[in-house]
């Protein structure tokens, strides 16, 4: 007697009988990009299992599991076997459920998978560099289990417009007053001009508008740079010709312009001018060894920190150490790179470390103005993140990574050597490596953030993070940060990554 279940579905059978045999779960998803499914994976599985998108249209899987063998056996490769072709998907539904639902790995595999390919389903793209060779647990469990958590963190980190305007208004009053008074008084800094830099002006500030960076730039014509011990980043500054009456001659140590002397006088003038400000509660913070900034503390009533950085502006060619830096040709374009390198470069009084002390005559190259341009024009498409263009999650990943490091530093003094510039440098390299806007789709925020974590962990493991503008200057060298600190940070990031970022719950 013909099975009545087969008669009810006979009019819809058009699939070839070659699709009958059930298959094992496909591993094509293991090779998918972390920012979206791989398009080829579905079509290859369809050749063996039938089009999985048709499964919901088939009759409900009412066949008892005990009937699976009987139905498969009854089905014959015949042109009239229409009913058998439609009944068979019900036999395979339990297997397909494990394949199609990435949220149920425990159903498919109660133990950690022995096949290394299978693990890639939850940890990101297989071709990325990262902490894969560290022996640490691999799966970005936080990103996988709580995809909305990162978005909630970003919402809390978003600055309120009211707070921004109030803080910016107060800072601008203080900075403009200092700038005017310095330009009016007869001193070596009469020609200074303002240049806004830092995370606030790059629109990547997090939590609260309580930190600002402002450059007071001073043009110095016809200077000659002497690289300090082949660092590529630190230089001795000399004048090719010192005009008679040049006020900067007061800061010379022989032929070399002393960064320490110049910063000391700059600091003295700012302290004098701050004392004249009566309507705002502002003071000058104690000097920090090796810091190029004069830090102001404004109470508004909340405390606002303002770093005023003296910078020498040179309109000459960029130093030879930067020739291979700024590798944006395949991302923002060769023309943009050429134009950026035609802009002036800057030197700040950040001294090179010499053992346990600092070399007081040295200056360090600064590219804050170029970094600001990149962050505000980060898309391969000119309209990226504009009101009329598609959005990306580049800056969101940067904010999350900055916040993660910031919170870890608050808890562990072993991380004092690390700073947000390390995060910024790492993500510049990631944007260069993955230049397409589609690779930073906001819908894939968790996997994009995990890519950044993996890259940063690999930099810590290999102790190598090249300066984005000066490739031979390694920001993670043993001379700058000891190995123990890098291993400590790596373990803390791995813990957060594999446990759903519990540190974010403290926000």
Swiss-Prot record:
Give the catalytic activity. GTP + ATP = 2',3'-cGAMP + 2 diphosphate; GTP + ATP = pppGp(2'-5')A + diphosphate; pppGp(2'-5')A = 2',3'-cGAMP + diphosphate
Query: Which residues are listed for GTP binding in this entry?
Result: 197, 307, 364-371
Spans of biased composition, class Basic and acidic residues? Answer: 44-57
**Annotated consequence of substituting residue 419 to S:** Gains susceptibility to mouse-specific RU.521
Q: What is the effect of changing residue 315 to E?
A: Slightly decreased interaction with nucleosomes
Q: What is its EC number?
A: 2.7.7.86
Instruction: Enumerate the residue ranges of region (Interaction with collided ribosomes).
Output: 329-370
Q: Where does Zn(2+) bind?
A: 378, 384-385, 392
Per the record, the domain of life is Eukaryota
Which residues are annotated with the PTM PolyADP-ribosyl glutamic acid?
176
Q: Which residues carry this modification: Phosphoserine?
A: 199, 291, 420
User: How changing residue 335 to R affects the protein?
Assistant: Abolished ubiquitination by TRIM56, leading to impaired homodimerization and activation. Does not affect sumoylation. Strongly reduced sumoylation
Protein's UniProt keywords contain Magnesium: yes
Disordered, as annotated region: 1-151
Q: Where in the cell is it found?
A: Nucleus; Chromosome; Cell membrane; Cytoplasm, Cytosol
- Tell me what happens on changing residue 238 to E: Does not affect interaction with nucleosomes
Broad EC category: transferase
Q: Which family does it belong to?
A: Belongs to the mab-21 family.
Q: What does this protein do?
A: Nucleotidyltransferase that catalyzes the formation of cyclic GMP-AMP (2',3'-cGAMP) from ATP and GTP and plays a key role in innate immunity. Catalysis involves both the formation of a 2',5' phosphodiester linkage at the GpA step and the formation of a 3',5' phosphodiester linkage at the ApG step, producing c[G(2',5')pA(3',5')p].
Q: What is this protein called?
A: Cyclic GMP-AMP synthase
Q: Which organism is it from?
A: Mus musculus
